[in-house]
Every structure is written in C-alpha cells, then in structure tokens.
Amino acid sequence: MTDDISKLFSRATRKALIGWETNLTAEEIIQELWVWYLESPYIQKTLESLHRGEAVHYVRNQVRNILSGAAKARDLFQERSHYSSENVKEALQGESTNRYLVDILPLAMKALDAQNGGYAEAIRSRYTDGISPKDKSGQNRLFRAHKSLTEHVNIIAITAGVEKDDKGKVIVKDGPGSKHAIFPDIRKSQGDGHSDPTANIAIMLIENPELRDGYLYEPPISEFLGGRCHAQHS
C-alpha cells in the first residue's frame, strides 16, 4: 500500500509541476503530500475509494495548492530569509561556524516548543538522542520540524534587523550577536517601569561581550535542545 501511495504521489507531482516555476523540489512536495495524507484519515479513505486516474487528479490538485501556497509564502517571507534548513541542520549538529545562528537557535527552539511540542521533540530525538526515524511518519515529522524551526530562526533574524549585503553576506545590525542588541524575547530594561534583573543582566552581557566568558556557561547544543541546561561552576 505504501509503495502504491508513493507512486501515486510521484506521478501526481510530476504532472502538477509541468508549467510551474518553483523553488520546491519534487521530493519536498512529496514529503508535504505524505504529511497531508498521514494527518487526515478522511484523505486516506478518499484515496482508497478513487480509481487510479481519479486519485492522480485528486492528489494533483493538492500539489497545486502546495505550489500556490509556497509561491505566496515565498513572496511574503522567503526573500527576506537568510538561513536555510541546511544551515539550521549544521547548527544543530554542532558544525556551524555562524555564531549568530548558534546564539539564536535556543530562542527558535523555545518558540517551536510553544507552537508544536511534537516538532520540538522530533528535533531533540534526532540531535540529542541521535535517533533517526525509520518510519515514513517519523521522517515526515522531522522534515516538517526542520522546516518550522528554520522559519522561527528566520523570523527572529528578520525581527532583529539582520540584512544581507550586495554579495549575499549576512550582516547583523541589531539583535543577538551585535553590540547594541537585545534578544527579541528579552524586554523590560532598567527604568522601564518593572524590575527584571534577568533581562538587565542579559542586556549588560550583550552590550559588554568581554564579560560573557567569565559570567556565562555555554552548554553544548544537546543540552539546550533537551531542556537540560543547568548552571555550572568550575
């Protein structure tokens, strides 16, 4: 049954892509189709009841919905995005040399956890526990988790004022990693009407990076992914 569905998705995707200009690959679209299929018992029953040609037409319409939605999202968001899913994966694996990206990754994970705990757990399972999902459902959940986490990373970066120069290099004007930055989720500085010592300390450390090494313990990626970040003293 799984092989039949895979062939159906592949055929419908090839047909729908004719005449479309998109940055999405056929594989990415098929991944989206699997999520659409697995998350809806109604869709599963509908496809089972249709003849082959009808099923291809039905799925092709969904592919067009995906392509249309992707085009709108690209116009509204993607052109301002600076980090790809591959960039985020490198950071999760501890292989990224982009200090700014590594700095904002915990904030993005926190946002993802609040939005979809299942996606956040899929990330932790993969990068903290080292478990790669073998089943199609788990693989698609991880695929969507990467995509969602990347969106949160880019939202934080855009909100913080990150831009690109003419050569495409990321420039941090404000936000985490810059001299006069405040993390998007850190508010209420001194004199702002409320006492928030945590925010005051955070702002002090952001504005005075030379104090960070002596004040902050930076846990490895696996610790903040698993919510196991604890203060340590040497």
Swiss-Prot record:
Protein name, entry field: Gene 53 protein
Organism: Mycobacterium phage L5
Top-level division of the source organism's lineage: Viruses
This protein's encoding gene: 53
